[in-house]
Amino acid sequence: MSLAQQIEPPQADPGWSAHLQLRFIQREGVTRLGARRHVGPLLVQRPFYPEGAPCHVYVLHPPGGIVAGDRLELDIHLEAGSHALLTMPGASKFYRSIGPTAHLAQRFHLAAGSTLEWLPQDSIFFNGAQASLDSRFSVEPGARLLAWETLCLGRPVMGERFDQGAIDSRLCIDLPGEPGLHERLRIEGGRLDKVGGHPLVATFCATPADQAVLEQVRQQLEALDTPAGATLLGPLLVIRLLDHDNQHLQRNLQRLWHLLRPAVLGLAPCPPRIWAT
């Protein structure tokens, strides 16, 4: 089935729909964007190759943000042996809603021997937002993954709390022969007790990892002045960080990535250029 055949026409909805599908392939030792297809304002810039074989791609969310009833779908397929690093130049903004829920669904399939680095900007939920996030990763044998997700509840830099609204966030990572990670976080009406009262929560996952990698990460986390922890679920390393300052949190995530990229992928760090702006 072609990418074009897989995308169904948008259905009638109070909001608008956007769908982006990307397929990465390896040719002569270099990862290429073998196919792309989009419906609506969910796009990618041209690929970058700052380190040779891996393909760096920037995913562009709608600049106007996400409002009531909007539906965004992102489907990423990595074929065997390919390596893609995906990030975003800006945050995903979910605005206040007095009506339908806004939906963001993200699907990632990692074929055998492929590598994905999913390093997006944060998802910001304005006070009163009604939003559903569903991120799922399917990891085949020999594939490698570095992925983080950051939720910003309200706009702490402006003193805005998340006092109203509801967030339903699901994160699933399926591993071959392992239970992986299946979790759900629901936040309603300003009740941030599940995250210790912190408006920012980040999850960083890496596989394959082992006890030695876990110990390296824990040593780095011990130096932080904000709550953080790490654990191993089989070969999956799961790191959690809480914060009140988004820039501080992003710096800590990037430091962890600088540690984990050589430890898990065997590659020297090559930060996306957007991080320097």
From Swiss-Prot:
Segments crossing the lipid bilayer: none
Major localization class: cytoplasm
A GO CC annotation given for this chain: cytoplasm
Localization terms from the record: Cytoplasm
Keyword list, A-Z: Chaperone, Cytoplasm, Nickel insertion
Molecular-function GO terms, alphabetical: nickel cation binding
Organism superkingdom: Bacteria
Function (record text): Required for maturation of urease via the functional incorporation of the urease nickel metallocenter.
Family: Belongs to the UreD family.
Subunit architecture: UreD, UreF and UreG form a complex that acts as a GTP-hydrolysis-dependent molecular chaperone, activating the urease apoprotein by helping to assemble the nickel containing metallocenter of UreC. The UreE protein probably delivers the nickel.
Protein name: Urease accessory protein UreD
Species classification: Bacteria, Pseudomonadati, Pseudomonadota, Gammaproteobacteria, Pseudomonadales
